[in-house]
Amino acid sequence: MADSDSYLKWAACLLADLPADWERELAVVRTPIVPSPLQIAAAVGEGPLPPVLSARSLRRTAQRTKPDVIVVACTGPVVDVLVAEVLDEVRPRPVFVTGLPGISVPATDKAWLFRSGCDLFVVHSEREVAEFGEVAGRLGGGGLLGLARLPFLRGPVPPGFEPDGRERDRVVFATQAKVPRAREEREQVLLALAKLAERRPDLDVVVKLRALDGERQTHNERHPYQRLWQDLGEPGRLRFAAGSMDEHLSLAAGFVTVSSTAALEAIDRDVPLLVLEDFGVSAEMINLVFAGSGLLGTLDDLADGVFRAPEQEWRAANYFHPAAASTWVSRLGELLGGERPPPRSLLDGPVHAAARRRARLRVEVPPEVLRLGYKTKRRLARVLR
């Protein structure tokens, strides 16, 4: 079960990696960040479209089907409340699997705390295993760690492949909701892309959007790129598009981002890329993992069309380990066949009860009703000042 666009893509790909004789079912949890039908279709690719279910419907489905495993592919507070409250009476108790849908370096205490009630936490590199192992040892609680290749990393397209007979002439900028945060920084990126488009008329320069105007995504975006471009007066030849990243990369001659996990998809598809360092390389910019990768560069590099390939040593330590090194399916088998007691959630108890109640509202109350309630609360607060 997934609650947002990025988690849905991760869940759909992860389920596809399970043994062929396992029965699988995918569902979307109805929350305020539920993906749109177009986002759902892009996330699951050619697979069947999953239903969007309320928490109550999810609970009834789990009680009826009695699954052996439930993959809780959701944002942290939703993982916690689903496992601790919504699904806690499903019997026999399933193995709860969780994880993060992309780059998780540096490992954070918060990510572990919210998921500490799950039996298996899936991570995607040797570095993440080490970092979350340190967090687990320090905080306690939680279940096992399992290593997996990021499930949407499938290898490069065959040499000479040209989808629909087209050449690779696209430069793809993968946007993110959280970084860079400042309006001025986002405008700088757009202007550098516009310079590239002006200097290289042979290239199709595309701003790849996570969500169209009005659609929700995992994190709220304060300054959407398309609106900024309109505010700037559209001073150049840029194209804005949503849809599947896989489709965009199949046509890409270059790729650029501040820190998107899609950079790993570009590496996987042998697309030259650039990770912008103009706004810093730090945990706050979510790009610390790219230090030492050989991929960091500047807005000037972008305007000049300079893209790079990663250092091989960095690649092996970060997300591109051999498939044989993955442990998550074997760890899952151990949990299914063993008598390991359920893990202890570090958020049980009165200290976190109020936060858990708020999370429960997000999964129980229809999003439009919840938004109306929040709006009414803000209005009352202004009146009562």
What are these regions, as identified by a protein language model?
Residues 1-69, 381-385:
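N-terminal pre-catalytic "stem/leader" segment of glycosyltransferase-like enzymes
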Residues 10, 153-226:
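Conserved catalytic-core segment of nucleotide-activated headgroup transferases in glycan assembly
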Residues 23-33, 122-125, 206-210:
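Short internal beta-strands
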Residues 38-115:
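Extended catalytic core of nucleotide-activated donor transferases of GT-like folds
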Residues 90-147, 153-154:
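Active-site-proximal region of nucleotide-activated glycan assembly enzymes
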Residues 254, 270-277:
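Structural loop-to-beta junction motif characteristic of Rossmann-like glycosyltransferase folds
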Residues 287, 296, 300-385:
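C-terminal amphipathic helix plus adjacent low-complexity
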